[in-house]
C-alpha cells in the first residue's frame, strides 16, 4: 500500500495497478496474463482491496527480511515470509482453477450433472464428467476403478481435483469414506494423506517421506 497524499489513508497499490491493466486496450489474452500476474502478487502479499484498510501492507514492510540474503534464507522471519508467500500463491492458483472448473461446468451443464447441491465433491465430480466421460458416458479404462461411492466418479482423479481446488478437507473425507476400496492397493495411503493434510505447509514428516519414497521406488521404478 501507499499513503494517499490527500487524506492520509492507505491505498491498495496492487489493486491500483490491476485497474490500470484492465483499462488497457490490447489483445485480451495478453491483458489477462498481465492481470493474473498482479492478482497472484495480491494473494502473495495479502493485500486487501479496501482503501484505508485496518491492516494495510505498508511500503517496504517485507524489505528487512528479503533484502538480507542470510536473514531471508536462514532466520525464522525468513521462513515465515516464504511460507506466507507460498500460501498466498497456492491460494491464487486454487481460486483460479476453481473459476476454470465453474466455467467448464457452466459450458456443459447436461453432461456435468452437478445436481442441486453444489458441494465441493459434487463440483469436482461434475467437472470430471465433462472432461473425462466419452459420448457413451463411460470413464477411461485406466480410471474406471476404483470409483467414489458417493459420486461414482474416478476416485483418484476426484481426490486430486479436490486438492487442486483447495478443498483438502473434502479430499480427506473422500479418502476416509472410500478407505475399503483404497486398502486393497494402498494400505498406508490414508495415514500418509491425513498427515499431509494436517500439516499447515503440506509437508510429510521425514520418516513418512522416506518411507513413501522407498515405496515409490519399489513399486514404480524397479
What do the predicted segments below correspond to?
Residues 3-162, 169, 173-222:
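Acidic, serine/proline-rich low-complexity intrinsically disordered regions
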Amino acid at each position: 500500500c501507499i499513503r494517499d497524499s490527500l487524506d492520509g489513508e492507505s491505498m491498495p497499490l496492487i489493486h491500483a495497478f490491476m485497474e490500470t491493466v484492465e483499462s488497457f486496450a490490447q489483445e485480451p489474452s495478453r491483458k489477462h496474463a498481465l492481470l493474473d500476474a498482479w492478482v497472484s502478487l495480491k494473494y502473495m502479499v495479502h493485500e486487501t482491496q479496501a482503501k484505508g484498510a485496518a491492516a494495510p501492507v505498508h511500503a517496504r514492510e517485507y524489505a528487512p527480511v528479503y533484502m538480507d540474503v542470510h536473514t531471508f534464507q536462514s532466520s525464522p522471519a525468513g521462513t515465515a515470509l516464504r511460507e506466507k508467500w507460498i500460501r498466498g500463491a497456492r491460494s491464487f492458483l486454487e481460486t483460479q482453477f476453481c473459476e476454470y472448473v465453474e466455467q467448464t461446468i457452466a459450458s456443459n451443464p447436461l453432461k456435468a450433472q452437478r445436481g442441486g447441491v453444489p458441494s465441493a465433491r459434487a463440483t469436482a465430480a461434475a467437472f470430471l464428467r465433462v472432461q473425462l466421460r466419452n459420448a457413451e458416458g463411460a470413464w477411461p479404462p485406466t480410471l474406471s476403478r476404483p470409483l467414489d461411492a458417493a459420486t461414482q466418479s474416478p476416485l483418484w482423479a476426484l481426490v486430486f481435483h479436490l486438492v487442486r481446488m483447495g478443498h483438502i478437507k473434502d479430499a480427506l473425507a473422500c479418502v476416509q469414506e472410500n478407505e475399503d476400496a483404497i486398502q486393497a492397493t494402498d494400505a498406508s495411503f490414508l495415514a500418509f494423506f491425513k498427515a499431509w493434510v494436517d500439516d499447515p505447509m503440506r509437508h510429510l514428516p521425514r520418516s513418512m517421506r522416506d518411507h513413501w519414497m522407498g515405496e515409490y521406488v519399489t513399486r514404480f521404478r524397479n
